[in-house]
């Protein structure tokens, strides 16, 4: 499929045009027509009903839903993706409420600041959906995408969406969506691209604290940050004056290795080696909450169970339904930019960290190898990292 950039899609939306938004292939893997309520014209919903044919819904922010008393359709939401349907509505000025014109009126009244809860009949023919406050950074759904896109165009936080169906009633995917795009000359974007757009556009960290931290390897300055959209807590150790071409270690949290000194991995040894190096040469350690390459502690323990049955660290993750590495280094890049650092010497054996930082504007001037000894318990793990994951060890 041929996707457009987010800026061109925003321009189309602001011109009153709908666009196609495609979600993750591991999710619904479908395309929705999306329009911004404030900018859409009288033909938008008619076009959705005639050409897309899916259910026409109206994503709104939580503030709008609460102000208009749009309560959840059911108390026990068992939808597989947790879509927050409210009770359906018609505006009181409609007749049957089902015509394209009347559904447009109902949608427009949702964003009218003078509208009140009593102005909507329930049930009706338009289906509001409530978006998560943090948008696609909290949930990668079409609901959140529509509200985020509305905000990015400067409009009130509401949209109208409709799934795209083929002529035979099946859901349009892949090349079907490409043909739909070309036939109707529409912009098409992915939710993944919208997520990356927002990450680059908006600050994601908040500085919270700074203290002196004496350790077995020297005394460091410890900074505490909070991730704005996930509430994760990140700590940073620094030694000496902070400067360009700083020596930097990105260390993914590993409770078993860092705290309990597990010999299944080399994480604890790499952390200690990096602390010694930074203490001697100056630099920074960014300690990221990315347990188990992003799958979390309990899932890492489940992966260990599979490793005991003959899997390796990569195939175990895959068997559990995860990619081999879920880590993203945008938060690390944001922290570096907080300290006005754009060029670093990276303490790492992992090429994916180089690429992960480069895509967020961080230049890697030099790689500093982190050398730690193998143990009888982590030999296979180290070999897998080298052979399957390309680690430079």
Swiss-Prot record:
It comes from the Bacteria. Zn(2+) binds at residues 254, 265, 267. InterPro entries: DHBP_synth_RibB-like_a/b_dom, DHBP_synthase_RibB, GTP_cyclohydro_II, RibA, RibA-like_sf, Riboflavin_synth_RibBA. Its EC number is 4.1.99.12, 3.5.4.25. Keywords: GTP-binding, Hydrolase, Lyase, Magnesium, Manganese, Metal-binding, Multifunctional enzyme, Nucleotide-binding, Riboflavin biosynthesis, Zinc. GTP binds at residues 249-253, 270, 291-293, 313, 348, 353. Mg(2+) 1 binds at residue 28. Binds 2 divalent metal cations per subunit. Magnesium or manganese. This is Riboflavin biosynthesis protein RibBA.
């Amino acid at each position: 499929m041929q996707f457009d950039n987010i800026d061109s899609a925003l321009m189309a939306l602001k011109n009153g045009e709908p666009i196609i938004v495609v979600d993750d292939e591991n999710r619904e893997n479908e395309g929705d027509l999306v329009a911004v309520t404030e900018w859409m014209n009288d033909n938008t919903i008619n076009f959705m009903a005639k050409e897309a044919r899916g259910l026409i819904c109206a994503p709104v922010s939580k503030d709008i839903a609460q102000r208009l008393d749009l309560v959840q359709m059911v108390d026990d939401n068992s939808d597989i993706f947790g879509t927050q349907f409210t009770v359906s509505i018609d505006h009181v000025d409609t007749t049957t409420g089902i015509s394209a014109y009347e559904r447009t009126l109902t949608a427009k009244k949702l964003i009218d600041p003078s509208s009140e809860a009593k102005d909507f009949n329930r049930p009706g023919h338009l289906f509001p959906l409530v978006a998560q406050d943090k948008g696609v950074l909290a949930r990668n759904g079409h609901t959140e995408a529509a509200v985020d896109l509305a905000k990015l165009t400067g409009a009130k936080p509401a949209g109208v969406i409709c799934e795209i169906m083929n002529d035979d009633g099946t859901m349009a995917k892949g090349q079907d969506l490409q043909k739909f795009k070309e036939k109707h000359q529409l912009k098409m974007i992915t939710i993944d691209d919208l997520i990356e757009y927002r990450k680059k556009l908006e600050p994601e960290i908040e500085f919270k604290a700074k203290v002196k931290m004496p350790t077995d390897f020297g005394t460091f300055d410890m900074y505490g940050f909070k991730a704005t959209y996930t509430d994760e807590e990140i700590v940073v150790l620094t030694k000496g004056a902070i400067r360009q071409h700083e020596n930097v270690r990105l260390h993914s949290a590993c409770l078993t290795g860092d705290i309990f000194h597990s010999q299944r991995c080399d994480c604890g040894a790499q952390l200690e080696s990096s602390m010694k190096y930074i203490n001697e040469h100056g630099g920074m350690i960014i300690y990221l909450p990315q347990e188990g390459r992003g799958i979390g502690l309990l899932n890492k323990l489940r992966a260990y169970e599979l490793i005991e049955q003959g899997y390796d660290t990569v195939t175990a993750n895959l068997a559990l339904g995860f990619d081999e590495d879920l880590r993203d280094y945008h938060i690390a890049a944001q922290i570096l930019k907080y300290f006005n650092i754009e060029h670093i010497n990276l303490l790492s054996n992992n090429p994916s960290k180089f690429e992960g930082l480069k895509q967020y504007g961080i230049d890697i001037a030099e790689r500093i190898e982190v050398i730690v000894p193998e143990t009888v318990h982590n030999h296979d793990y180290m070999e897998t990292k080298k052979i399957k994951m390309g680690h430079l060890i």
